[in-house]
C-alpha cells in the first residue's frame, strides 16, 4: 500500500493559518475582523 497524499503537520498549519500569522499582515487582520463580525465561535483554524 502506498502512503496517503495528505500528510498533515500541526506546526505548518499554525505557522500559515494561526492567529499570530493572521495578525502579521493587514489582510490577515481583516480576515479576523470579518470572522468576528460574522460571529464565528472560532476565529482561526488552530
From Swiss-Prot:
Record-linked Pfam families: Ribosomal_L34
Cellular-component GO terms for this entry: chloroplast; ribonucleoprotein complex; ribosome
Major place of residence: plastid
InterPro entries: Ribosomal_bL34 (IPR000271), Ribosomal_bL34_CS (IPR020939)
Places the protein is found: Plastid, Chloroplast
Compositionally biased tracts (Basic residues): 35-46
Disulfide bonds: none
Example of a GO MF term: structural constituent of ribosome
GO biological process terms on file: translation
Keywords: Chloroplast, Plastid, Ribonucleoprotein, Ribosomal protein
PROSITE patterns: RIBOSOMAL_L34
Keyword Chloroplast: yes
Region (Disordered): 24-46
Domain of life: Eukaryota
NCBIfam families: rpmH_bact
Similarity comment: family membership: Belongs to the bacterial ribosomal protein bL34 family.
Protein known as: Large ribosomal subunit protein bL34c
Amino acid at each position: 500500500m502506498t502512503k496517503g497524499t495528505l500528510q498533515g503537520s500541526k506546526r505548518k498549519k499554525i505557522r500559515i493559518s494561526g492567529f499570530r500569522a493572521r495578525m502579521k499582515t493587514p489582510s490577515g487582520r481583516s480576515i479576523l475582523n470579518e470572522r468576528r463580525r460574522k460571529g464565528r465561535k472560532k476565529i482561526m483554524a488552530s
